[in-house]
C-alpha cells in the first residue's frame, strides 16, 4: 500500500492504542471497507503490517509504503479514500509475493525538512548563545531586529515579567500565557528578517558535512560512541529556498535513528546562526562525552519517500511491475504535499509559533558548541 499523510494531530505512524495514529486509522477503515476482519483490525501483526519508514508524532509523509495482508478488490482504493480523512490518502495498492517486507526491502529513504528563513537569524548580544560563541560572531544586521524586538518587549511586559522570561533557571512551559505572549510578539518581529545569500550558503555548507558514513551517536538517544548501530550513511543533501520565507532541506540516507534528522538540522542551524565553521559538525561524530544537540520541531519533518532500487531490479528482471508511483500519482502526491502538508506546517507556525519557540530555546543554550 502506497500512502501519504499529514501527521499533525497524530501520535506517529505506528499503531499505539489508545493514541490516534496513522496505522490505527488505516486499520479501522480497512475493516469498514471489508478488506480485513474485525478481529484483525485490532491486531496489526495478524495482517503482517510493516512500514518502510516509521514516522514519529507530528511527522508527515508524502509517500510511505505498508506491506500487509488484505482482501483486495477492484474498488478497495476508492472505498478507502472515501472513508479516510482528507489528511490521509492511499495512492495505490499493489500485490507482492508473500515474503515481501516493506522495511527490509527498502534500500534508502528521502526526507525533507522545512524551516522558516528567520530561524537563521544571528543570536542577540544579550543571549547565552551569543556569549558562548562571542569570539566567532561578527555582526550581520541581526542585532537591529533584536533591538526592535527589545523595544517592543519593554512596551508590552513589566520588568518582573521580563526577568522571569530571561531567567534560564525558571523553565517556563511553552504553554505558559506569558511565554505565549512573548513568542507571539517575537513571531511578528522575526517575520521581517531578510535572509542573506551568505547565511543560506553557510547553512548549506554545514548540512553538507553530514554526507558520508559517520557515527551519529550524539544525534539520537541511548547510543554511545563506538556503538556500530549508531553508524549511518548519508547519500545526499540538497538545500533550496522552497517558497517565500521557507527553506527546504532534502536528505537521502540508508536509514535514520530516532530524532536524528531533527538534530542534524538543529546543529546546522546553530552553526549558521553563530557563524561557526561548517566543519564544527564533525566534532559531534568524534569519541568522547556525549554532546548536547537540541531537537528541531517535528512539525517541519516529512518523509518524501522510500527507495526500493534493489527490489525493483529483481522485479524488472522478472518482468513484474516495479514498486514506485507513476507520473499521474506523483503529481497527486506533489499536490497533496503543497495543499495538506506544507499548509499544515505554515498554519502551525502561525497559530503555535513552534519555530519561534525553537529560536528562543536556542538563544538560551548554555552548552558550549565549540
Curated annotation (Swiss-Prot):
Enzyme Commission number(s): 5.4.99.44
One Pfam entry name: PseudoU_synth_1
Classification via SUPFAM superfamilies: Pseudouridine synthase
Entry annotation: catalytic residues: 56
Reaction(s) catalysed (UniProt annotation): uridine(27/28) in mitochondrial tRNA = pseudouridine(27/28) in mitochondrial tRNA
A GO BP annotation: tRNA pseudouridine synthesis
CDD domains xrefs: PseudoU_synth_PUS1_PUS2
Cellular component terms (Gene Ontology): mitochondrion; nucleus
Keywords: Isomerase, Mitochondrion, tRNA processing
Binding residue positions for substrate: 111
Family indicated by similarity: Belongs to the tRNA pseudouridine synthase TruA family.
Protein name: tRNA pseudouridine(27/28) synthase
Provenance organism: Saccharomyces cerevisiae (strain ATCC 204508 / S288c)
Designated gene of the protein: PUS2
